[in-house]
């Protein structure tokens, strides 16, 4: 089963290991971790991640996010830090302000990134492929949108079923609840009247990721064809697959 790392000063830290593929294989633990921002990590939490095997951190946040909340591994002498501004510095809120169904809104945003930020998606995947000997952690702010998009590509490379990938995506609803109530919830929204299932429905429904995969399959034939089309080499694809499946 996938592993959640319960750190007191970081949200949504999860291992991509433990998922069955369509051929009956299981993705390996301690290869790729996905998470939210790491700027509040204590020395103890940093040590826990290093003990888990983390040797590379890939930060997918926007420039202003990195400047406002620098990653604690930015100046580490033991962990390599890579910043890739995956989505550019446009306002994410513009997508949400359009209103409408959450799955439509969120999937439209992800598809926009996948179609309009191809060089940066490629850069992220190539960086992940280059750091496969140990554990690599990739993160954004909440570990849901940018990270969820990249995680879906990694799992697709390993032939994990689309339904499972969508389920992995929705788990952010479970592990972002504390942040939601700490930082985002209106005063009248409480744990008593708003559960993680409600959050999941409002912010990360499975249907959103299913729509993304439907788009890529319709436009490119397969997810792997999309990955190849943006210039990710066969060697990099093989490295990712080997890391997660052995």
Regions found by a protein language model. Give the residues of each.
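Cys-dependent protein tyrosine phosphatase-like superfamily
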Residues: 1-137, 150-246
């Amino acid at each position: 089963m996938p592993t959640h790392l319960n750190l007191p000063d970081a949200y949504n830290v999860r291992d991509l290991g433990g998922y069955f593929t369509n051929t009956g294989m299981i993705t390996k633990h301690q290869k790729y971790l996905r998470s939210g921002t790491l700027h509040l990590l204590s020395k103890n939490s940093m040590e826990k991640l290093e003990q888990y095997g983390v040797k590379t951190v890939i930060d997918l946040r926007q420039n202003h996010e990195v400047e406002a909340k620098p990653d604690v591994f930015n100046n580490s002498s033991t962990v390599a830090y890579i910043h890739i501004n995956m989505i550019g510095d446009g306002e994410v809120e513009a997508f949400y302000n359009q209103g409408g169904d959450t799955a439509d809104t969120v999937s439209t945003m992800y598809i926009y990134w996948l179609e309009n930020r191809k060089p940066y998606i490629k850069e992220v995947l190539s960086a992940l492929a280059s750091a496969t000997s140990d554990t690599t952690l990739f993160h954004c702010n909440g570990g849901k949108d940018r990270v969820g998009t990249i995680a879906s590509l990694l799992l697709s490379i390993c032939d994990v079923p689309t339904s499972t990938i969508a389920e992995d995506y929705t788990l952010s609803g479970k592990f972002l609840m504390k942040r939601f109530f700490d930082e985002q919830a209106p005063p009248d929204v409480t744990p008593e009247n708003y559960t993680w299932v409600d959050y999941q429905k409002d912010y990360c429904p499975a249907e959103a990721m299913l729509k993304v995969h439907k788009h890529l399959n319709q436009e490119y034939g397969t997810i792997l064809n999309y990955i190849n089309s943006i210039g990710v080499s066969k060697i990099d694809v093989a490295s990712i697959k080997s890391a997660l499946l052995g």
